[in-house]
Amino acid sequence: MYKVALFDLDGTLINSEHKNREAWARLFRRHGVPYDDSVLRSFTGRPAKEAMADHVASFAGHSVDELCAEVAAYAALPDMPAAVTVDGAMELLHQLQQMRVPLGVVTSGPRDYAESALTTLGALQLLDVLITADDVSRGKPDPEGYSTACSALNVEPSQAIVFEDAPAGILAAKRAGIFCVGLTTTHDAEALAEADVLLKDLTEVRWPHIGPS
């Protein structure tokens, strides 16, 4: 039986991918840089600066920091799509807390964003650990975030389970040696093929019977 449950944030507990993708799309349009859906998907589940570094050469005369600040400004505009709670998220968190299962979130977002989003969700006070982009030197798909969470909760990776919606996050969990449940909330099943189990969303979780016994 798993001793701790670790969750990604965006796309796993809250669905802000429409908002995030529109912010990145506005950046590309504003600078006249061609893009398609695969480009926008490449930002999902990764720290903004690391993902932007893959494309900064197309934005002549601009730094990664400048471009990420511009994206953040777009994301804060009132006309952007609103973030919504993923189905089953709060119900599962409350269930696990009542069962005394330690909970953690490992996100590619900065701490101020994560704490604000989790407070709005009503989940921040339920967590035993929160690992953000500010707490690691390498973001997903590097396993550092999930390994750090396991260390903070004093468990071995084999004693944890991760819930993720993005390929980068699934790779991070697997590289950390953790059983990973992929949620098809933002990507299709083919994109999440590295996950150990695939579910539609968190309403399909039947704790603790997930994966091998």
Swiss-Prot record:
GO molecular function, one term: sugar-phosphatase activity
Cited Gene3D superfamilies: HAD superfamily/HAD-like, Putative phosphatase, domain 2
Pfam family, one: HAD_2
Top-rank taxon, per record: Bacteria
Reaction(s) catalysed (UniProt annotation): validoxylamine A 7'-phosphate + H2O = validoxylamine A + phosphate
Enzyme active site: D8, D10
Keywords per UniProt: Antibiotic biosynthesis, Cobalt, Hydrolase, Magnesium, Manganese, Metal-binding
Residue sites binding substrate per the record: D8, L9, D10, T107, S108, K140
GO biological process terms, semicolon-separated: antibiotic biosynthetic process
SUPFAM superfamilies: HAD-like (SSF56784)
Family: Belongs to the HAD-like hydrolase superfamily. CbbY/CbbZ/Gph/YieH family.
Purpose: Involved in the biosynthesis of the antifungal agent validamycin A. Catalyzes the dephosphorylation of validoxylamine A 7'-phosphate to yield validoxylamine A. VldH is also able to convert trehalose 6-phosphate to trehalose.
Protein name per its UniProtKB record: Validoxylamine A 7'-phosphate phosphatase
Annotated source species: Streptomyces hygroscopicus subsp. limoneus
Taxon lineage: Bacteria, Bacillati, Actinomycetota, Actinomycetes, Kitasatosporales
